[in-house]
Amino acid sequence: MANKLVYTSAPKGLMPGTFGFCTVAATRGMTKTVVDALEGLAGYRRVYETTDGASLNPVAFSHLLVDTPRGRLRVLARIADALPDYSGRTNHIASFLQLGDAETHESGPAELFYTPGLFETQWPNGQPPIFYPSPVEIPMEEGACPRSCEYWRAVAGDPGWAGVLASTIETRRLAILVVPHSIDVLKLFYEAIAILPANKRWDATFATYYTNALRNVDCLWRGVVVDSPEEAQARAIAGNLVLDFRTLPSIESFKTNPAIWRWIEIAREPISKLAPTLKTPLVPAPSLQTPPPRVSVQVPPSCATVVPSAAQVSVPDPATPTPQKESTVAVPAMKTQRNSQ
């Protein structure tokens, strides 16, 4: 079971007196520490300022470890541009799951982003804020067997590159993928995680669309957009693994490094007969169309129109909350802000 929180711009937030960018839905009983930590991750930076930005800007999928005064949190986040809010201004929606160890099934974190219904993809104007009465049940499927990394073959020329990325789990080496508009970074991470041993898949923390807002969290694999500030910063730090999909070197150069070459050979293996079929993701394959002019500040990948999903849980209006047990901590009031962080 996992706590869930949704953050977007709305005329009325979950707590009395909140509006603008605020929490509009949360699992009843979440502590202030958890709420504050998730809201601190809810910022979003656009690549394109267009009338249809929600379909062109990247969707940020993240698996993060976040330190708080009361311990470390494991967080899955889906953050995306959204249609204009109730006031006509730009908007985005952030949907979070805070997981415990019992929810770390063998398929790994990326698998959950392909599971329908776990993350909110829109919050219609006028929809009232809600408390989810109980935590979200996480599907506990059998672990994925290593599969052939066909998407890596398609975009990098050799599935072995997935092994280069996977090798960083052993060394804890920071890995940065510099990607153009057309590459689906979530699919790259999904395949690389699949070749890891089942007990190592949750060691892969990642952000498909990394920005400096995430600098104080555990995030080992980072997708950054071409020519972004984050790309320049990554190259300035010695020891980082930087995979620039515009200029990948010959993969044969890794033959002199047995530790990495072993993973390259694993990634080149044919698909296992036991490997599950890849589900249809919440975000279809990115369009290869020529992107529109960018705004002055640039950022990362994974663009596409998302399939909307409305909240599925019937819950009471926060104006008349259901009585809680004394041991339950109610979701606290948050400061009213219009700033999109």
Named regions from a protein language model:
Residues 288-290, 294-341:
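Low-complexity, Pro/Ser/Thr/Gly/Ala-rich intrinsically disordered linkers and tails that serve as
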